[in-house]
């Protein structure tokens, strides 16, 4: 039952029970109040009064969203935004046409096929609404850069011995390819194996156990002692969601880990020596050496490592229906599309502009556009208290009563929250630039449905989605969760001293767990596996200078996890998140101990991101 519907049901039940008591005292009213099938007009009046009193009760118990929403929008706006559907896009280069590496940049727009008969196949008599929704193409934006090269992976094989681990990755290139046409530093692997155990174990071995590598082509051997694998997803250029500059990346990493952990199974090859001119590139093997054998039960296949893959997210720019403010309303409905309301949802309001009516011909075209400032920003102008002149726009949201998600509106206010008069608008027509999603439609797509380019697409490659888009997630509207989030953002050293406090902070960021009971149960089991937490100050030398930082040790029970690799991935995410708790010019280092095997992993020191002022 929806949060708002609960109040209505409780108030209606209270009125009906009260009606039965009143009918006992006044029997002549029993026909109207006590009987279930009584007077329909009285029933409608009771339902209307229950709706009004339920709305009033909800307002009294809503935990002051006027305060929490404004504060969260300035500190971490993505918590109040929906998490769109996400998927992985794989490109298939035409190796005979590629002469040099071709880059496909992030923010490239792609879409699904417009005609989707499978969307209405389950209904015997689909109505016109279903036909409209099925004809809307879902637009996705590439989240990361990708380089296309005339290379393919033929096979991935576990060649481990009793002393060391070995993985052989066999490549093939076009017969006309030369070493000058290839750049191995631009290779990105995606651990696309459907076996979660294998991909998590590979993640652990790639990050912790890699010693060196070599290229093998027949009798030709080229040592690569400096090669290493960089885990993707932690740098700001790897962000899936649009991220405000004033928000620390640790929040982003934690949110993306809970909402789409698939984005962290990408690795970049780094520090690979250039290929010699006489190296045979038509068929060669990259051999990775590890300091211990790989587990015997991992299953390596041809698709265990995939090339030319990148995450994509269901976000795109769109313009809202025009708004003409007149100063008579406190807020105005903000709709992405009046024609297709169930096909578009607002993720973010980017800019608000209007055309200024200028008399004469001396003004330049650029001066005819008015850019309205945002109310929840750090760009308020200095004004005298009784001479408010600047008008700001304010994006407001509330839970929708008619569909999943939020209802959006836009208000125009002065800095003190007062509503400006009609003379401030001059009959302006407001144009609102949005970043939108396609609501629930992407969740109905299947593998291979996203395969159409919108703008420019390399003529030397085709693409398609190789994973089914995830289910969109709506923001949590519970006021208690908002206050918990604000408390979690109050970064201090004490948060790393108590186990229960840390677990509560992590649960606050678990948006899938707030929507799916099964995901919440699994997440709770994994967080409860943190048996002990210890944080203490430490001193280490950096370039000969002693620097004081924080060292945190976690003791984790491995039972709820798939394998040790899943624990290691969680630790990698936490090492970036804990850097928020160390001040600038300081650092934080994390250590995790497996309580069963007593194996320990320690991450490199992360420089502090918590400003002192």
Regions found by a protein language model. Give the residues of each.
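Mixed-charge (acidic/basic) macromolecular-recognition segments
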Residues: 1-24, 29, 36, 228-277, ...
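Extracellular ectodomain segments of secreted/surface proteins
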Residues: 41, 53-60, 78, 153-164, ...
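Short, low-complexity Pro/Thr/Gly
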Residues: 176-382, 387-390
